[in-house]
C-alpha cells in the first residue's frame, strides 16, 4: 500500500446507543422460526441488529453535510469477549455503544477493527484507547489517522491477516483502493459474512456517496478482488444501508460504470 495520500476527514456514516426497547422480527426459514432481535437506545441514535447468535450489526446515526446518516459496523460475541468492527462517529457515540453492548452481553469489548480512517469508522479512537481496547488497522490507516488528527490505531494488519478472538475466526483483507486509499473488508469464515464497509454500497444507494478521497478508477478492480477471494458469501454488511448478499458487490460495480 502506498502511504502518500492524505485523506480528508470524510465519512462513511452511523446509528447506535443504550438498551431501552427491543423489537423482535420473526421469519420462517426451512420451516423453522428464526427470531431476530433489534435493540435501540431511547433516542434512536444507536441500534444493534442480530444476524445470528454471535454476530450483530451496530448502527449509529451521525451527521454528514447537515443530514442524519446511519453507519454500520459489527459486534462479535466471542468466547473471550466482544469485538467490534469499526467504532462510531465520535467518542460520545462510541462510549454509549460500548456500554450498550457490554450490558447486553455481560462481556467486555476487548478489540476493534478499524476499516479506514474516516470519522464514521475511527471517530471513537480516543475512547478505545482510554478503555484499553486494542484498535487494529493497517499501517496506512494508522498513518492517515495521525494526519487527520486522530490518535493512531495499532497499524498491525497486513494485506491479508487472519485473527482469532476466542472461538471466532476473522480475516481482514485489503483489496485495493476504492472509497478511500486504505479501505479494508472483514470476513467471518465460520458464517461466510462479509463486512464490505464503505467499499460496498447498499441496494438503496443511487450513487457512490462521499467520493472526496475516492479512487473511482481503481474501485471496480478492488470489488473484483473481493469477489475472487470470497466466492461463497451468505451476507454482506455495507458501510451504510441495509444488509444484503453478493448482489451488493454487483450493485456497486454497476454504480461504477
UniProtKB/Swiss-Prot annotation:
It is found in: Periplasm. The keyword Zinc applies. InterPro entries: BcII-like_MBL-B1, Beta-lactamase_class-B_CS, Metallo-B-lactamas, NDM-1-like, RibonucZ/Hydroxyglut_hydro. It catalyses: a beta-lactam + H2O = a substituted beta-amino acid. Residues 1-30 form the signal peptide. Its EC number is 3.5.2.6. Substrate binds at residues 201, 210. Its cofactor is Zn(2+). GO terms for molecular function: beta-lactamase activity; zinc ion binding. Inhibited by captopril stereoisomers and iodoacetate. Also inhibited by chelating agents such as EDTA. GO terms for cellular component: periplasmic space. PANTHER family: ACYL-COENZYME A THIOESTERASE MBLAC2 (PTHR42951:SF4), METALLO-BETA-LACTAMASE DOMAIN-CONTAINING (PTHR42951). Monomer. Confers resistance to the different beta-lactams antibiotics (penicillin, cephalosporin and carbapenem) via the hydrolysis of the beta-lactam ring. Active on cephalosporin and penicillin. This is Metallo-beta-lactamase type 2. The lineage of its organism: Bacteria, Bacillati, Bacillota, Bacilli, Bacillales.
Amino acid at each position: 500500500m502506498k502511504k502518500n495520500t492524505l485523506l480528508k476527514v470524510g465519512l462513511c456514516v452511523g446509528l447506535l446507543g443504550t438498551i431501552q426497547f427491543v423489537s423482535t422480527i420473526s421469519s420462517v426459514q426451512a420451516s423453522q422460526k428464526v427470531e431476530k432481535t433489534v435493540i435501540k437506545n431511547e433516542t434512536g441514535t444507536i441500534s444493534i441488529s442480530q444476524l445470528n447468535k454471535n454476530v450483530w450489526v451496530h448502527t449509529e446515526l451521525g451527521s454528514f453535510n447537515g443530514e442524519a446518516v446511519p453507519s454500520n459496523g459489527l459486534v462479535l460475541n466471542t468466547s473471550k469477549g466482544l469485538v467490534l468492527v469499526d467504532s462510531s462517529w465520535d467518542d460520545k457515540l462510541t462510549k454509549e455503544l460500548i456500554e450498550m453492548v457490554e450490558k447486553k452481553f455481560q462481556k467486555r469489548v476487548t478489540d476493534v477493527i478499524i476499516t479506514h480512517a474516516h470519522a464514521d469508522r475511527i471517530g471513537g479512537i480516543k475512547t478505545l484507547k482510554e478503555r484499553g481496547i486494542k484498535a487494529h488497522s493497517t499501517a496506512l490507516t494508522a498513518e492517515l489517522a495521525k494526519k487527520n488528527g486522530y490518535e493512531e490505531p495499532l497499524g498491525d494488519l497486513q494485506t491479508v491477516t487472519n485473527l482469532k478472538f476466542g472461538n471466532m475466526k476473522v480475516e481482514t483483507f485489503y483489496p485495493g483502493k476504492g472509497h478511500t486509499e486504505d479501505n479494508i473488508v472483514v470476513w467471518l469464515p465460520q458464517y461466510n459474512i462479509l463486512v464490505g464497509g464503505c467499499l460496498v454500497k447498499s441496494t438503496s444507494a443511487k450513487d457512490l456517496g462521499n467520493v472526496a478521497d475516492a479512487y473511482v478508477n481503481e474501485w471496480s478492480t478492488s470489488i473484483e478482488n473481493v469477489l475472487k477471494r470470497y466466492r461463497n458469501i451468505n451476507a454482506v454488511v455495507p458501510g451504510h444501508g441495509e444488509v444484503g448478499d453478493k448482489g451488493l458487490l454487483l450493485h456497486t460495480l454497476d454504480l461504477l460504470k
